[in-house]
Amino acid sequence: MARQFSLEKTRNIGIIAHIDAGKTTTTERILFHTGKIHKIGETHDGASQMDWMEQEQERGITITSAATTAFWKNHRINIIDTPGHVDFTVEVSRSLRVLDGAVTVIDAQAGVEPQTETVWRQASEYKVPRVIFVNKMDKVGADFAYAIETLKQRLGVHASAIQWPIGSENDFNGIIDLVEMNAFEYDNTSQETGKVVSIPSDLESITQTKRKELIETLSTLDEELMIYYLEEKPISSEMLKNSIRKATLQASFFPVLCGSSFKNKGVVKMLDAVVDYLPAPCDVAAIVGFDSDNQEIVRTGLDEEPFTALAFKVMTDPYVGKLTFFRIYSGSVKAGSYVTNTTKGTKERFGRLLQMHANSREEVKEAYTGDILAVVGLKATTTGDTLASEGQTIILESMNFPEPVIEIAVEPKTKADQDKMGIALAKLAEEDPTFKVFSNHETGQTIIAGMGELHLDIIIERLKREFKVQANVTEPQVAYRETITQETETEGKFIRQSGGRGQYGHVWMRFEPNPGKGFEFVNKIVGGVVPREYVPAVQKGIQEALAGGILAGYQIIDVKATLFDGSYHDVDSSEIAFKIAASMALKETKTKGNPVILEPIMDVEVVTPNDYVGNVIGDLTSRRGRLENQESRTNAVAIRAFVPLSEMFGYATVLRSNTQGRATFIMQFAKYEKAPKSITEEIIKKRA
């Protein structure tokens, strides 16, 4: 099957935003206006096409990223709708890794919110060009100018309006195009019909001002435009459009549009902006990978190059089994062909190739550069793995995911549940890199860990609904961590000789704090005092010992371990002996490395009416919260603080009580910090 759309006519975009900004509603309107669906489903009715999971429909939120494809003005647009809730940021992160552009949706009344900042930061890490859609212009308190100001103040970006609203709240009924210098008035039908009209006379002055501001902002980024502007030459709409596209592709400028997805106003104009300003796969930089010798390999994104793709998501489909979602960066692949998983060094066979629409699917025979599809039949591939044509060794940069911060113990209710639970949890962990399953060695309990209470609630619900596993759960526990704060050198020596062949392993290790960089192992052995074949065993021994902790049994993080000396025995040395010796060396850091317990700190934002500001601040302070700032919003105050997770259990109920149910809050993991001495002593005592 030949390619249907050229690379230039392809767009891979994501819809990203804070929860309740209207992402899924916006995606539904895109699908409706592009003819992908013929009846609009509403999120609040549980009828959204993209929110296909039962839990999504019941809760009215997006939990998993859903992929679909739409067509607009002879362009193919692959769309991924992502969650806005902080517990599911992994879905945003892995989607952005494979997308070329994004539409950031913000609420016209609230402006930039905490999760907007998080998804914006994630998109910036991957250098994803974005257009910004200020949604809910029909909402009480909607303020387009305020929303743009929050973009500049809170995100610190070059963002300018390329549209201006005609009216707001109930009177929002049109959009002025600052590029074409015309206006579009809507009638109130679901078709987003309307007509091009001249700019209303009472808005002519502000239109000229805002167009001038747009040109001034762009001229600082575009030398040709600056010359025209300084010489007061007329700037055509075509020239302005080209300048916007160029700056947007460089992610140095972000055009701002407005509308109301729910009322079908502005979505078609936003689709035009996706085609006009967001990149095609051939507009983005060449993809760089490395071979097994760490030599750089470049793929420029052509169908003629060898097949190279990245697996970014794994999920279990009740009808076809394991589905692996992947993005093709070069070359093409046919259903039934064999490829290499270069990350794991294994051979995989591509079964059926599927073009997804939420949870429905359409089979295709061949896929090309720039395509985002799902494949059936991959056995060993997991999120972040590189797939390449046979004989290729390229490995693309993988993805990093945050560590879980909250844990609960799960116990199967019956023997039948016990048999099914292990398989079910393994499948769920394979799908979600921020969900972890492990056993408590002391109690024998199965522990599941995730990014928040909602995250784990959804996991338990999926166990029941999808896998028919009934389980009892304990109260949530904080996922504390341990680390060392002082560099130290320790010796680990393991000798067992009781007749016959013995065991001999001997290492000298240097352990150093490694803040924010995780575990790092360095081999500094010279002269073969520890033979090369035993070095991996030393590393493995340390990694296994890190998982068990040295103070209270919590995982040790952010440590650099250097093997610099040791000895061996020609006959008695073995891998197991060196593993044990390495773990003994790590345990010595309990007395020499000044170990501490780390607790997860949450970034909390509470939005409350003015009357309750004192109550909210007093309560946050009593929870060991550190106030960062407070900011006036429309008829409310936003209070931001860093608070230990251990102090936030049950906070929703207390906040409701303190504010008569009129305040809202959101929290997300910020960092790990050293726990106070009293908390540390209490934790160690409990774990003793």
From Swiss-Prot:
GO cellular component, one term: cytoplasm
Single GO biological process annotation from the record: ribosome disassembly
Localization: Cytoplasm
Superkingdom assignment: Bacteria
Domain tr-type G per the UniProt entry, residue ranges: 8-282
Pfam families xrefs: EF-G_D2 (PF22042), EFG_C (PF00679), EFG_III (PF14492), EFG_IV (PF03764), GTP_EFTU (PF00009)
Record-linked Gene3D superfamilies: 3.30.230.10, 3.30.70.240, Elongation Factor G (Translational Gtpase), domain 3, P-loop containing nucleotide triphosphate hydrolases, Translation factors
List of residues binding GTP: 17-24, 81-85, 135-138
InterPro entries registered for this protein in UniProt: EF-G-like_DII (IPR053905), EFG_II (IPR041095), EFG_III (IPR009022), EFG_III/V (IPR035647), EFG_IV (IPR047872), EFG_V (IPR035649), EFG_V-like (IPR000640), G_TR_CS (IPR031157)
Cross-referenced PANTHER family: RIBOSOME-RELEASING FACTOR 2, MITOCHONDRIAL, TRANSLATION ELONGATION FACTOR G-RELATED
Function: Catalyzes the GTP-dependent ribosomal translocation step during translation elongation. During this step, the ribosome changes from the pre-translocational (PRE) to the post-translocational (POST) state as the newly formed A-site-bound peptidyl-tRNA and P-site-bound deacylated tRNA move to the P and E sites, respectively. Catalyzes the coordinated movement of the two tRNA molecules, the mRNA and conformational changes in the ribosome.
UniProt cross-references to HAMAP family, sorted A to Z: EF_G_EF_2_B
The name this protein goes by in its record: Elongation factor G
Source species of the chain: Aster yellows witches'-broom phytoplasma (strain AYWB)
Taxonomic placement: Bacteria, Bacillati, Mycoplasmatota, Mollicutes, Acholeplasmatales
Gene: fusA
